[in-house]
Structure formats: C-alpha cells, structure tokens
C-alpha cells in the first residue's frame, strides 16, 4: 500500500469554509473505520481531513452538483487517500443505488437543499444508517444583518418598493436555527444539537466591499438580483459600500445542526 506522507489539515488561509468546518468537526463523532457521505463537498473542505481521520479502513464519498468543483477536488487529491472519492451528484436527488453511510456531513450545505429543504433532508436520511450521525453547517438567518439593513435603508431613500420587497424575501428565505431544529425533530432524530457561533468578516469600503470574495458570491449578488435595472443597482450598492462604518462589524452566523438517526425510526 502506498505510504501516506501528506497531511490534510483544514487550510488556515480559507476564511470561510474552514471556520464553518471547524464547528462541524466540533459536533462530529469521528473515528477510524467510519463510512462518511460528505454532501456539497466543493473542493474538499473538510472531505480530505475526514478521509485522513477515518483511515484506509474507512470510506469517504464527497458529492457535489458542480462538475468544476468535483474536478478541482480530484486535482487536489492526485491519487492520495484512495478510500476517498469525489462524484458529481445532486444531493437533492440521489440514486437509490447509493448505499447508506455511518456519517452524513455537509459543510456550507443547507442552502443547496432549496427550494424544498425539509423534503431534501428527509431524502438524505435514506442514505444514513440507523444509529448514524448527521452534521451539516450553513450561514443561518441573521447572517450579515447589518448589510441587509443598510441596503434596505438605501432602497428606501430611492423610493424603491418592489426591490425592497424582493430583498426582504431573500433575507427571510434563509433558514434559522429554530427552523432546522424543527426539521430534525420532525424527522425523529435524537441527540439533536443546533449551535450558532459568530464569525466576523473584515472588508474595506467601496469596490473592496462590493467585490469581496466572501460577500459578493453568496450574499451581495442576492441584493443585485432584486433590481431589474442593473445601473440603478450599481448606484444604490455603491452608496451602501461607501458607508462601511455603519455596517461593521460584519457578522456571519455559523450554524451547525447535528442529530442521530434512531435505530427504529417513526415516520412523522
């Protein structure tokens, strides 16, 4: 067998995926020999770490709907950790042929279960063994509230009614800690834990704010989508970006949900 020389610790330079993975690992019962299904595996945080911990007697399968993310993860792997594999698969519609695992993890994953998150989570549990553990993380309701409030204020100054309604809908669509606890209870999970921890994101003002790699992709783009007129969107968002002081600190809520599948489940 090929001797493993590389270590697969969580990358310290990642200011988003790693902090969320840390709260996931804080709830995960992890030991050698486990089989793990890691959903929304992206480029491998924390799939590589999980594979290193379960060792060659275990199995880790990372799935992601993005072919480019799967290709990136495979390129990083480069033949290491042969008991780890990455596959392109929509976690909302997994084939019945996919087996059940002892652990089901997903870092920054809950948002990708939409539009019917509860039904999608119920489907995930078909691939968790009885007595197995589910641990998922996501940025919960309340994440970057100061940003949404400032954008709403600026929209109000411009007299924008439809755009404000769309923004409110975007914000309300994000699940809360109470929401996900309710899902786990309805799914008859046991030893449920739902924990939120703050994460401060640092940014400059102006274009540094508007193009911030953590803020733009999953958050500010939602605000831009509220506008039919993108020139107006740019004008409003530029005004917001120049008022960074009123929004700081920029706080995300790292939410981790965990629960154990009963050996004998009761459908509710």
Where are these regions (language model features)?
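Conserved alpha-helix/loop element of class I SAM-dependent methyltransferases that forms part
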Residues: 15-34, 49
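Class I SAM-dependent methyltransferase SAM/SAH-binding core
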Residues: 37-39, 43-94
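Helix-to-beta-strand junctions that scaffold the AdoMet/dcAdoMet cofactor pocket
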Residues: 55, 113-114, 128-129
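A short acidic, Gly/Pro-enriched loop at the edge of an enzyme's catalytic core
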Residues: 95-104
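A short glycine-rich, Lys/Arg-flanked "PGG" loop and its adjoining helix->strand segment in the class I
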Residues: 118-133
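Conserved catalytic/acceptor-binding region of the Class I
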Residues: 133-204
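C-terminal helical/coil "lid" or tail adjacent to the Rossmann-like core of SAM-dependent
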Residues: 193-247
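Core SAM-dependent methyltransferase catalytic element
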Residues: 255-268
